[in-house]
């Protein structure tokens, strides 16, 4: 696995990441055990970067990543927000961003 440094964070992450939309189970039934095994397999292959979003399984993907991170606190997790509302500029208020951020923080632990 190749790694790159994120200079501003003084962190090194894998150049390949794992997207976790499928772990949210919107796409099919994925047990928590299977989801965690998938994350562990990626970790064992050298993946240290994981991508998620607050809408993946209505936060389920973030919550599963939170459990994974208990075993791997050095994992780098990026989440996205802003897909819970109609995609119009006036829906993206500072208050909405604060609420979405807080919800993801709670989900991710």
Name each model feature, range by range:
Residues 1-76:
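N-terminal binding-site loop/beta-alpha segment at the start of enzyme catalytic domains
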Residues 64-67, 80, 96-103:
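Generic beta-strand or strand-like secondary-structure segments
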Residues 25, 72-78, 99-107:
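Short, Lys/Arg-enriched charge-dense amphipathic segments
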Residues 40, 88-109:
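Glycine/proline-rich, positively charged
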